[in-house]
Amino acid sequence: MDSGAVPTNASNCTDPFTHPSSCSPAPSPSSWVNFSHLEGNLSDPCGPNRTELGGSDRLCPSAGSPSMITAIIIMALYSIVCVVGLFGNFLVMYVIVRYTKMKTATNIYIFNLALADALATSTLPFQSVNYLMGTWPFGTILCKIVISIDYYNMFTSIFTLCTMSVDRYIAVCHPVKALDLRTPRNAKIINICNWILSSAIGLPVMFMATTKYRQGSIDCTLTFSHPTWYWENLLKICVFIFAFIMPILIITVCYGLMILRLKSVRMLSGSKEKDRNLRRITRMVLVVVAVFIVCWTPIHIYVIIKALITIPETTFQTVSWHFCIALGYTNSCLNPVLYAFLDENFKRCFREFCIPTSSTIEQQNSTRIRQNTRDHPSTANTVDRTNHQLENLEAETTPLP
């Protein structure tokens, strides 16, 4: 919204999309945290609490002075999510890149999901500083980057989960077609397409994001054309439809058809081992999708209700909002944990990374030698000829019995 549309009273602190500087910043989990930018900014010390609470600021400390307990809890949450999310998601990406056996179509989609989550958690240090200072000190460029990353994360994640569900449907219900369609190359192309689709919202948001001086602090916020309320609510509704309702319908249809297929046949492929792996991977993807839906449904419902009706002020409402935010946070660091528990290949690769055995080290050295041989064939040929000459010389100089 433009500067003239920025509210100057306490009545907008509680809107999930409004962050006036007169309140203290709310915990902002990956994407919907900064969906507060739909009406507000990053430098709100109590986050989405005042408009939602009917204008009262009794639950919000004054600007720049969050209570010590609140600050400690929120900073601890930021730190845990940031460390676990970055380490876990980068470990997932490393394992997929490092091990040839992990370069399957499903795992390439998982790589895309991990990349989106890692980008989202990388914004938490900026949000932490913003919370403690009660202002945005990083300038306009970083403001644009942080806000756009949040939107990219939300849309790329849900689009990737949709893709994974369709991929599972093809693998289970159309195994013959799957041989041609489910290839790593096609998965990479689809991942790129998902990022391009996400740009339909990510790029406009980047241009809309800006910093504004207000009441002695700097807000990182979105600007909307007049009438502001119309464009704000239109964006909320579009996000609700295209980033929640439609993907959930696609995922539900895919898994409904898969369940019917799995119940109707005992053997999906000609091998019991392949059949077991197929069912295991399908179960893992289903759990990942279910966790995503559980984490994001409350905040989507909350925001769309607030866009349509006025919610009266209650303490329960404030607690509910922060609980929704916390759920959104946890999703960015939960997926690596799910892979570790649900997929034997990921579990084995994680174990090898954390506790390398002698056989693992030998295998890595062997892989490096083979790679060097492919990269430098002339050197390899020279070494082979030298070894052959030494063997001949040794045979010639060895005394006969």
Swiss-Prot record:
Q: Which GO terms describe its molecular function?
A: beta-endorphin receptor activity; G protein-coupled receptor activity; G-protein alpha-subunit binding; G-protein beta-subunit binding; morphine receptor activity; neuropeptide binding; voltage-gated calcium channel activity
Which topology term describes how it sits in the membrane?
Multi-pass membrane protein
Q: Phosphotyrosine occurs at which residues?
A: 169
Keywords of the record:
Cell membrane, Cell projection, Disulfide bond, Endosome, G-protein coupled receptor, Glycoprotein, Lipoprotein, Membrane, Palmitate, Phosphoprotein, Receptor, Transducer, Transmembrane, Transmembrane helix, Ubl conjugation
Q: What is its main location?
A: membrane
Give the transmembrane region(s): 70-94, 108-132, 144-166, 187-208, 232-256, 281-307, 316-339
Name a single GO biological process: adenylate cyclase-inhibiting G protein-coupled acetylcholine receptor signaling pathway
Lipid attachment, kind S-palmitoyl cysteine: 354
Q: Which residues lie on this side of the membrane: Extracellular?
A: 1-69, 133-143, 209-231, 308-315
What's the family? Belongs to the G-protein coupled receptor 1 family.
Task: State its role.
Answer: Receptor for endogenous opioids such as beta-endorphin and endomorphin. Receptor for natural and synthetic opioids including morphine, heroin, DAMGO, fentanyl, etorphine, buprenorphin and methadone. Also activated by enkephalin peptides, such as Met-enkephalin or Met-enkephalin-Arg-Phe, with higher affinity for Met-enkephalin-Arg-Phe.
Q: What is this protein called?
A: Mu-type opioid receptor
What's the encoding gene here?
OPRM1
